[in-house]
Curated annotation (Swiss-Prot):
Xref: InterPro entries: AceGlu_kinase-like_sf, AcgluKinase_fam, ArgB, Asp/Glu/Uridylate_kinase, Glu/AcGlu_kinase, NAGK-C
Described purpose of this protein according to its UniProt entry: Catalyzes the ATP-dependent phosphorylation of N-acetyl-L-glutamate.
Name of the gene: argB
Protein name: Acetylglutamate kinase
A Pfam family reported for this protein in Swiss-Prot or TrEMBL: AA_kinase
Catalysis: reaction(s): N-acetyl-L-glutamate + ATP = N-acetyl-L-glutamyl 5-phosphate + ADP
Coiled-coil intervals, chain numbering: none
GO molecular function, one term: acetylglutamate kinase activity
Family note: Belongs to the acetylglutamate kinase family. ArgB subfamily.
GO process annotations (BP): arginine biosynthetic process via ornithine; L-arginine biosynthetic process
Known pathway: Amino-acid biosynthesis; L-arginine biosynthesis; N(2)-acetyl-L-ornithine from L-glutamate: step 2/4
């Protein structure tokens, strides 16, 4: 028999009550999201930090067993840059986009589908045979259209870089219906020549997929706490914002935040009830966003 002091007993009871309160707080959100699709864009530090990658996988598995239908979309910028450096291929950026030659595209495809997707799937499947990799090139999932960029008022060629202009979610829905967690890489065949593929922005791809799937929510992991109205003033963090307010604010945002907030706006405009950017550097931030009343990060809602 193990003796326990009154102070220790009271402390244990307080901790137990706190945990129970947290579980009860999540009840309404479990009801709301039950059997609903949530699209999660995985990126930033969480992709290159082993511990954050592990907790991300735990969160995704938790969503699945809590009755949600999670879909993961990922990029792989840091890994692509590292592989290009290893192969002696120069990385060039124009207007915030990676210039993508046919040689670079082969590296992009190799890293996204052969490295990053497999790593994410492996992390999730450490908890059971749940995840399956799906390339944006598979079964017409994504269709892309080439885009350029404007630098100092001049249109510049980005090579094999594009925007997602059409989504056929059949392959993803098949995985969901089989009880799996789809892990989607952001690469898309060119609409003008399907034999050629394009490097597409993962945030935008996640938004387009969320719309096509009729998702309940889009969550984008970032390396900041959320949207700041006046960066770097940390007192200007926005917890929630309407789509019309965001549309007016978008041109004035810091350049690195624009693609992520534009993706949230695209999702909400397309019928997704809510979209959020959250700090992926915080362990289990995804659970805090989905299953607590106050959430974490910045949430975008329809006007």
């Amino acid at each position: 028999m193990t003796a326990i002091t009154q102070d220790a007993a009271e402390r244990d009871q307080a901790q137990a009550e706190s945990k129970a309160a947290t579980l009860i707080e999540s009840l309404s959100w479990l009801q709301r999201f039950h059997d609903r699709i949530v699209v999660v864009k995985f990126g930033g530090n969480a992709m290159v930090d082993e511990e954050l990658t592990r907790t991300f996988a735990e969160d995704v598995v938790y969503l699945r067993y809590a009755g949600l239908r999670p879909v993961v979309v990922h990029g792989g910028g840091p890994q692509i840059s590292a592989m290009l450096t290893r192969l002696g291929i120069e990385s060039e950026f124009r207007g915030g986009y990676r210039v993508t030659t046919p040689e670079v595209l082969e590296v992009v495809r190799m890293v996204l589908t052969g490295q990053v997707s497999r790593d994410v799937v492996r992390g999730i499947n450490a908890h059971g045979p749940l995840a399956a990799a799906v390339s944006g090139e598979d079964a017409g999932l994504f269709t892309g259209r080439r885009r350029g960029a404007v630098v100092d008022g001049v249109e510049v060629d980005l090579g094999l870089v594009g925007d997602v202009v059409a989504v056929d979610p059949t392959a993803v829905l098949a995985q969901l219906d089989a009880g799996r967690i789809p892990v989607v890489s952001s690469i898309a065949p060119d609409e003008s020549d399907p034999a050629v593929s394009l490097n597409v922005n993962a945030d935008a791809a996640a938004a387009a997929l969320a719309v096509a799937l009729g998702a309940e929510k889009l969550v984008i992991l970032t390396d900041v706490a959320g949207l700041y109205r006046d960066w770097p003033d940390r007192g200007s963090l926005v917890s929630d914002i309407r789509s019309d307010e965001l549309r007016a604010l978008l041109p004035s945002l810091e350049s690195g935040m624009i693609p992520k907030m534009a993706a949230c706006l695209e999702a909400v405009d397309g019928g997704v009830p809510k979209a959020a950017i959250i700090d992926g550097r915080i362990p289990h931030s995804m659970l805090l966003e989905i299953f607590t009343t106050n959430g974490i990060g910045t949430e975008v809602v329809p006007a």
